[in-house]
């Protein structure tokens, strides 16, 4: 278990700055299958998970939802036949926070 897996999300009130690019690059080394995607000026951590069918994709979506509820931090989820796209970012700051890296790390363990 990594240190990030042991951490929990902290409430973000919107006064924090998004993660600095250098720190984000360092954190990405812990989650190499995730990409930073610019979505209309908002950076997001994104990964596409693949599954054998829709039911497996849906089961994974539910597990991500349960994790999100337990941590009080919620992603965008796109569930399709055989794949789920998970996007983590912090709405309140319009960018990526350590909470998002923590959640991406925890999401990895749900597969």
Curated annotation (Swiss-Prot):
Asked whether the UniProt record includes Hydrolase among its keywords, one would answer no
Superkingdom of this protein's organism:
Bacteria
Q: Which reaction does it catalyse?
A: (4aS,6R)-4a-hydroxy-L-erythro-5,6,7,8-tetrahydrobiopterin = (6R)-L-erythro-6,7-dihydrobiopterin + H2O
Biological process (GO) annotations held by this record are: tetrahydrobiopterin biosynthetic process
Q: Kindly give the InterPro entries that the UniProt entry links to this protein.
A: PCD_sf (IPR036428), Pterin-4-alpha-carb_dehyd (IPR050376), Pterin_deHydtase (IPR001533)
Enumerate the UniProt keywords alphabetically.
Lyase
Instruction: Provide the E.C. number(s) assigned to this enzyme.
Output: 4.2.1.96
* Pfam families to which the protein is assigned, alphabetical: Pterin_4a (PF01329)
The record, for SUPFAM superfamilies, names: PCD-like
Q: Which GO terms describe its molecular function?
A: 4-alpha-hydroxytetrahydrobiopterin dehydratase activity
- What protein family does this chain belong to? Belongs to the pterin-4-alpha-carbinolamine dehydratase family.
Can you name this protein?
Answer: Putative pterin-4-alpha-carbinolamine dehydratase
Record the organism: Chlorobaculum parvum (strain DSM 263 / NCIMB 8327)
């Amino acid at each position: 278990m990594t240190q990030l897996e042991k951490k929990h999300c902290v409430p973000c009130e919107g006064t924090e700055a998004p993660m600095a690019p250098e720190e984000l690059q360092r954190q990405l080394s812990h989650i190499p299958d995730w990409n930073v995607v610019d979505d209309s000026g908002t950076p997001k951590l994104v990964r596409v998970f693949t599954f054998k069918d829709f039911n497996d994709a849906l089961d994974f979506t539910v597990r991500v939802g349960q994790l999100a509820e337990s941590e009080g931090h919620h992603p965008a989820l796109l569930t399709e036949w055989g794949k789920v796209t998970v996007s983590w970012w912090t709405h309140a700051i319009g960018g990526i926070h350590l909470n998002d890296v923590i959640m991406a790390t925890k999401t990895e363990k749900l597969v």
